[in-house]
């Protein structure tokens, strides 16, 4: 590998909207996410609709599924 062309690899704090946070390594010192393994329905086993942009309502309106 060539020297001094790669970005610095530092510890990174990942913060979720649910309040969970963990540390990993990345090029960025801080990352904010909407969904993590603590609140994602696949990992929690709960069935809730994750709809960040109103996609479900838009689909129902488009196909008249009220």
Curated annotation (Swiss-Prot):
InterPro entries attached here?
Ribosomal_bL28/bL31-like_sf, Ribosomal_bL31, Ribosomal_bL31_A, Ribosomal_bL31_sf
* Entry keyword Hydrolase: no
Protein residues bound to Zn(2+)? 16, 18, 36, 39
Which branch of life, at top level? Bacteria
MF-aspect GO terms: metal ion binding; rRNA binding; structural constituent of ribosome
Which Pfam families does the record match to this protein?
Answer: Ribosomal_L31
**Gene3D superfamilies registered for this protein in UniProt:** Ribosomal protein L31 (4.10.830.30)
HAMAP family, alphabetically?
Ribosomal_bL31_1
Could you tell me which NCBIfam families the record lists for this protein? L31 (TIGR00105), PRK00019.1 (NF000612), PRK00528.1 (NF001809)
Q: Which family does it belong to?
A: Belongs to the bacterial ribosomal protein bL31 family. Type A subfamily.
The UniProt subunit note reads as follows:
Part of the 50S ribosomal subunit.
Report the function annotation for this chain: Binds the 23S rRNA.
Query: What's the protein called, per UniProt?
Result: Large ribosomal subunit protein bL31
Question: What is the source species?
Answer: Campylobacter lari (strain RM2100 / D67 / ATCC BAA-1060)
